[in-house]
Swiss-Prot record:
Transmembrane segments: 104-123
EC number: 2.1.1.-
EC class name: transferase
Name of this protein: Methyltransferase OMS1, mitochondrial
Biased amino acid composition, Basic and acidic residues: 450-463
Presequence extent in this chain: 1-39
Coiled-coil region(s): none
Major location category of this protein: mitochondrion
Region described as Disordered: spans on this chain: 450-471
Keywords of this entry: Membrane, Methyltransferase, Mitochondrion, Mitochondrion inner membrane, Transferase, Transit peptide, Transmembrane, Transmembrane helix
Residues on Mitochondrial intermembrane side: 124-471
Length: 471
């Protein structure tokens, strides 16, 4: 009898699939062997890297590894290098940025301020003393009691000494050193540069010269004026024109393009050359064809007063018989006049009260080397342009009856920009300088207040003390 036993299902599953199990075991074995290989190989790589690092460390055992510096440390090193720099300006710059210098700067500032105050005090006292001396001398001059030395001293205090005045003042100072103090009856010889300088040629009548030069004058002079930017100066000259205007030595009318007719009531042109006056007339009519209050007169500046009176009805009062102008202008005319001082005096006679004379001229410069050049080329200049460009215009102005309001010089002092008035006329507000307008008056008032306080204090000290009553 055959007996069949029932096996469990799980056991039958394993018996029936022997191949699949063997495959599973094989895959597990391979996985384990691969892991072992990776582990072993990683150990091998670690050993190689360790050996390599060991070799590198042995090679670089003498090299010093430094810590990376901060910005502050780098800036400090750079500052120390600048302090040791061979360039002095670099060293000074580093010192100025140092902490020690910054701390001491306050002391320097305080010291500088104290020095400034002390200097300002002495300067103010000196300025006040000069102002008081000038006031005293001017008062004496108005009374007609000032001698020649005092007149020169007035010019020196005003800063208006000419070369001949400097030479005269030197003679008076020599007398002072010898012990002479009273100069009332003493007069020093004149050192007129316009007469003593042989390079300054004598004046002559230039009418015929400019008659022949008229047609080519503008073309010949254009380049010279452009090089020295003379148009700017001509513009300055004509901007002063207002009211009734007279232009003397108008030439070919080179100033017409700078006229502002909205500020002008009437205008008169004067020149000794008829040919030049025709060119002026043509230029004016081209620019202002409808303007009616204009006159073109041919004549000399030395005969200006006679020309103004010509054709006028005679009146009992001669002054009312003359034509008067608010503004008289002239550009480069004094150097061509036969008598420049007389011409200036004529300007003053035809000027209205509070009127102004505006001059643009050339003459001697402010430096000796430029004056030597002018002297050496004086004859050539006279023959080419008909002018004496090395005249000392300061002497000419001082010898006239005019009083200077403004004097500016350019081109090394050879170009003179002058504003003048009649003697006795008061300066306008806009003609007062900053020092004259604000500083001198305030300093005078301040110092006078100090003097009053000192006088009051001295009077109190001199007053008798009342006796104390005994009770």
């Amino acid at each position: 009898m055959i007996v069949f036993r029932r096996f469990p299902t799980c056991l039958l599953h394993h018996i029936r699939q022997p191949a699949s199990r063997s495959l599973l075991l094989e895959s597990q074995r391979r996985s384990l062997s691969f892991t072992s290989y990776k582990y072993n190989s990683s150990h091998i790589d670690d050993d190689k890297s360790k050996k390599k690092l060991k070799n590198v460390f042995q090679m670089n055992s003498n090299r010093v590894i430094r810590k990376q510096k901060t910005k502050e440390e780098l800036a400090k090193e750079r500052f120390e290098e600048q302090l040791r720099s061979p360039n002095r300006f670099v060293r000074w710059g580093a010192i100025a940025r140092s902490e020690k210098f910054s701390k001491g700067m306050t002391k320097y500032m305080i010291g500088a301020y104290v020095i400034f105050l002390i200097y300002g005090l002495f300067f103010t006292k000196k300025l006040f003393a000069k102002d008081k001396e000038l006031e005293r001398l001017l008062k004496k001059q108005e009374e007609g009691n000032a001698n020649e030395y005092e007149a020169l001293r007035i010019k020196e205090l005003k800063g208006k000494l000419r070369r001949r005045d400097e030479l005269k003042l030197e003679e008076y100072k020599k007398m002072q050193e010898e012990g002479i103090e009273n100069f009332d009856d003493i007069r020093v010889q004149n050192f007129d540069q316009n007469k003593l300088n042989e390079q300054i040629l004598p004046a002559r009548d230039t009418t015929n010269f400019y008659q022949e030069k008229a047609n080519e004058y503008d073309k010949a002079i254009n380049m010279e004026e452009r090089v020295i930017f003379l148009g700017k100066r001509r513009k300055w000259l004509m901007k002063h024109c207002q009211g009734d205007v007279l232009e003397v030595s108008c030439g070919t009318g080179r100033n017409i393009k700078y006229l502002d007719m909205s500020r002008i009531n009437s205008i008169t042109f004067l020149d000794s050359s008829e040919n030049m006056m025709e060119i002026t007339h043509k230029k004016f009519r081209e620019k202002f064809p409808k303007y009616k209050k204009v006159a073109f007169v041919v004549g000399k500046a030395e005969n200006l007063v006679d020309l103004a009176e010509k054709g006028k009805p005679s009146l009992e009062n001669e002054k009312e018989n003359q034509v008067k102008y608010d503004t008289i202008v002239e550009a480069f005319g004094l150097c061509s006049h036969e008598d420049p001082v007389k011409a200036l005096n004529n300007f003053g006679k035809l000027l209205k009260p509070d009127g102004r004379i505006i001059l643009l001229e050339h003459g001697r410069g402010q430096y000796d080397f430029i004056n030597k050049i002018l002297d050496n080329r004086a004859e050539r200049r006279l023959n080419t342009w008909g002018c004496r460009w090395n005249l000392d215009l300061g002497e000419v102005l001082d010898d006239s009856d005019l009083e200077l309001v403004e004097e500016k010089r350019t081109h090394l002092g050879t170009t003179w920009c002058i504003v003048a008035k009649r003697k006795g006329d008061v300066k306008k507000k806009d003609e007062l300088g900053f020092v004259e307008k604000y500083l001198q008056s305030s300093i005078r008032k301040r110092m006078e207040s100090f003097e009053k306080k000192d006088d009051m204090a001295s009077k109190k000290e001199l007053e008798p003390v009342p006796p104390v009553s005994k009770s």
